[in-house]
Amino acid sequence: MKYLLAPLVLALAAAGTVTAAEAPATKPGPASVSELTTMAKRFAPVELRADTSKLSKGDRAAIAKLVEAAKIVDTLQLRQRWANNEALWAALQKDNSPLGKARQDYFWLNKGPWSIIDGNRSFMPAEYAGIAIPARKPDAANFYPAGATKEALEAWMNALPAKDKEAAQWYFTVIRSDKAGKFRTVKYSEEYKPELEKLAKLLREAAAHTDNASLKKFLTLRADAFLSNDYLASDFAWMDLDSPVDITIGPYETYNDELFGYKAAFEAYVSVRDPEETRKLDFFGKHMQELEDNLPIDKQYRNPKVGAMAPMVVVNQVYGAGDGNMGVQTAAYNLPNDERIIRERGSKRVMLKNIQEAKFESTLKPITKLVLRPQDQKDLDFNSFFTHILAHEITHGLGPHVTKQGGKESTPRQDLKETYSTIEEAKADVTGLWALAYMMDKGQLKDTLGQGEAAERKLYNTFLASCFRTLHFGLTDSHARGMAIQVNYLLDKGAFVSHGDGTFSVDFKKIKQAVIDLDREFLTIEATGDYARAKAMMARYVVIRPDVQKALDKMKAVPNDIRPAFVTAASLSGAGK
């Protein structure tokens, strides 16, 4: 799974549910130059940099090879997204008129002729250079035969022997039809053979450059996987990757398959580890039991033995490609998705720090100038923002995970049904905020966030501003709905104060206790599996009140997201778009 700005916005772009800062810029029919320019402006251009100065000569050479490999992933993504994508891209590049250049620009941002944040609607004419362009991205993408219905494919799959059915529904196969119109399953290793052979060669060359054993092992096994179509061993090696160079490359996410959600799209993230930020995770891990033992909840619901923290690393991205550089930028991802790995080893979360920092600069800073009072704007602090994101992710592991219903063991997810994701995301936000305040008071964060009034002002004012960053996208996902609960509850408690003009502030005499009370409410709902209480809380608080709407109305010109230029990649290898 990937995240647009974890924990702030869930990655719903692929489902077409991310709301634009303004009304959708597309309308039926092709977009004009001015419309395409307006649409593109929703993505703030940023120069993405990562510090590679401490890498060995061999690792720098390996990154250059990996960036070269990632460019091939872009080609694969174009092909997987739509059968005519590559032909359309080639035709577009022949048109150097202002309209042609605007189309090229927006096409590349979306890796196709459909605007992702406008519900995957086309910005092109119905036909271009003899190529018919659907008004919306086909649900089947290019994973299934053009024109094949879901019903026909399901009937065919259901008639197959169990092993063949599993192959037809597997992540790494496509379905094609022969001359007689009969469906057949084709492995990625066959369907994309020329590109995968090139990828395998480049990964082996990168492996030869690095002297890091775990990186060498992963690259070698992933090169083998591209040719064998068996990714299991290389996924285990990716879980064990412990290298200054961090690489995710291959077919992973299934969002592009909107017909069944079976087929994995190729993506690449070439990054370098951030050891300092990753050490913060280790620090939190050492205090997990202490935090659990002090959660604002009845003692009977605390876990006397908190499990090990799931693997998590912080990186700075050097290059992104394919599904990893399309539309709204991924800020974190949780992989692999293969249930065999998850059952045995769990999954690994990768946090892209420089992507989140770029989003902070391009979206949260302008929002702060609109919704915080002038005297509070100086408190906006990336370190507080990012550390709270880390705390959010970590505190998903705290609190109740088992309930008792009628004498039988259950889980909050089962008990709370459709309300669970909203309650859990809000719980992680608030528990993360509580945990940072608790550790600040204990002096445990003196060397990172600091201690005392100035540090608390930064923490809470940054959190207040980030609330509006989430609500900027509308109440379309569990993170935003959870944030609406938090904002409205804290307003009702007087911990957040509305000044009637679309600006807000924190009452520092009330905020700590209000956060504790709200956290207790979320934790108790989960501990008791109280579905009715969760429903009532959502009915009361999942709304945009007039004072909050006034702030959101001022934010229409704030960019939705960023558009990175991979400056470090270009300096290392001549890469970059």
Regions found by a protein language model. Name each.
Residues 1-19:
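Gram-negative bacterial Sec-dependent N-terminal signal peptides
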Residues 27-218:
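N-terminal helix-rich structural modules
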